[in-house]
């Protein structure tokens, strides 16, 4: 059994209500379970392959899920990258290997299923790209209309293409992501349209399965630290909740330090952590090459600050140049192709190791959130162009070896 509870004033709400924030104080909501009633079959947990719905007993859904086989993403042991950064043990959890190419699939399989369960037959979101792509695809699978609002000219074309091809109504607004989110929240409050941004607590329940899977894939041992990119701040919150729930249920016995990485041009959470402020100061004009985390007023900031502080973690910002260098390292040292925002985790890890904040003997998991093909234009912009040669073997040899045979 479960219900919703405000993290600010403690007001409680029925699971049958269509509600996104507290009606009394506008605080964020969390899904609260009766853990004493949840019985986990450890033998089944240890033998069944990871996927979102493997953990159905810890998800707030009663009906058949809308699924395209999300989850079960690889956890790569990255020895060459670890050596370059200077730590002993590094893993990369590559969420870009989900069906739509990002971690958002985990939230949307639960969120769209919940929409149907609540009798909502149209869904909507604002997006920097990945959310719109995932919602369009899960909406198509469910057979319901999808509306997405994007900041005009600020979204990678690979992500826009996904939303368009899968039939979403795509609106490019003259404004940034935060403007789009404010508008879609107003729309969903006035119409019978279900909001599936990460302010929706049910969506985050799907994303917490990343934490479940990491523990699962490490034989239920918890890493010392999770390092991940932070945009709207739902993922760092959700993953920490996943680890907390496994500990509550006695499946694991410790918690990782949650470490959030933001781009220098868009880092309100980093500034709040470093200053000790109880809340963020929104940034009006966030800018970074990492479009997926170009968010100046993250809606889950309160939850994220709590997760970082409670876990003994930290937050750090990185430059666009550091992000793009890490993107190349992931690809060229480990064969892991990610979009720029994903690489922020590795860029941040490198910086924090160099600063002495992260110990070289720590076991670290970096989350990479989206696939390389989400934003191919950035790759083309920062990599060397293909070498054009004549169609003969001597020209080929000269291009490769510097001389003809």
UniProtKB/Swiss-Prot annotation:
It holds the Pfam family PALP. Gene3D superfamilies: 3.40.50.1100. Its cofactor is pyridoxal 5'-phosphate. Its EC number is 4.2.3.1. GO terms for cellular component: cytoplasm. Pyridoxal 5'-phosphate binds at residues 130, 231-235, 369. CDD domains: Thr-synth_1. Pathway: Amino-acid biosynthesis; L-threonine biosynthesis; L-threonine from L-aspartate: step 5/5. Belongs to the threonine synthase family. Catalyzes the gamma-elimination of phosphate from L-phosphohomoserine and the beta-addition of water to produce L-threonine. Does not catalyze the conversion of O-acetyl-L-homoserine into threonine. This is Threonine synthase. The lineage of its organism: Archaea, Methanobacteriati, Methanobacteriota, Stenosarchaea group, Methanomicrobia.
């Amino acid at each position: 059994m479960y219900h919703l509870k405000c993290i600010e004033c403690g007001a409680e709400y029925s699971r049958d209500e269509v509600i996104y924030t507290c009606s009394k104080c506008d605080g964020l909501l969390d899904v609260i379970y009766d853990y004493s009633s949840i019985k986990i079959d450890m033998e089944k947990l240890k033998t069944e392959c990871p996927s979102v719905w493997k953990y159905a007993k810890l998800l707030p859904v009663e009906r058949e899920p809308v699924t395209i086989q999300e989850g079960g993403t690889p956890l790569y042991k990255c020895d060459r990258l670890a050596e370059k950064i200077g730590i002993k043990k590094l893993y990369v959890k590559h969420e870009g290997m989900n069906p739509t190419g990002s971690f958002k699939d985990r939230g949307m399989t639960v969120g769209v299923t919940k929409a149907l369960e609540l009798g909502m037959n149209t869904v909507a979101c604002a997006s920097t790209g990945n959310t719109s792509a995932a919602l369009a695809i899960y909406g198509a699978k469910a057979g319901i209309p999808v509306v997405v609002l994007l900041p005009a000219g600020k979204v990678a074309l690979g992500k826009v293409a996904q939303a368009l091809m899968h039939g979403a109504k795509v609106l490019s607004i003259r404004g940034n992501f935060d403007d789009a989110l404010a508008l879609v929240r107003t729309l969903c409050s006035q119409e019978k349209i279900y909001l599936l941004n990460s302010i929706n607590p049910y969506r985050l329940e799907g994303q917490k399965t990343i934490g479940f899977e990491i523990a699962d894939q490490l034989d239920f041992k918890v890493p010392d630290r999770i390092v991940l990119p932070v945009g709207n701040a739902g993922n760092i919150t959700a993953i920490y909740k996943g680890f907390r729930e496994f500990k509550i249920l006695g499946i694991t016995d410790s918690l990782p330090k949650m470490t959030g990485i933001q781009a220098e041009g868009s880092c309100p959470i980093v500034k709040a952590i470093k200053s000790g402020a109880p809340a963020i100061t929104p940034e009006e004009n966030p800018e970074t090459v990492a479009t997926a985390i170009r968010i100046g007023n993250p809606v889950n900031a309160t939850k994220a600050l709590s997760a970082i502080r409670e876990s003994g973690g930290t937050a750090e910002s990185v430059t666009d140049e550091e992000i793009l260098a890490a993107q190349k390292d992931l690809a060229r040292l480990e064969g892991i192709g990610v979009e720029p925002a994903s690489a922020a985790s590795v860029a941040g890890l490198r910086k924090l190791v160099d600063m002495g904040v992260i110990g070289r003997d720590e076991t670290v998991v970096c989350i990479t959130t989206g696939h390389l093909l989400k934003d191919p234009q950035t790759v083309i912009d920062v990599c060397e162009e293909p070498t054009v040669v004549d169609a003969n073997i001597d020209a080929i040899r000269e291009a490769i070896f510097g001389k003809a045979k």
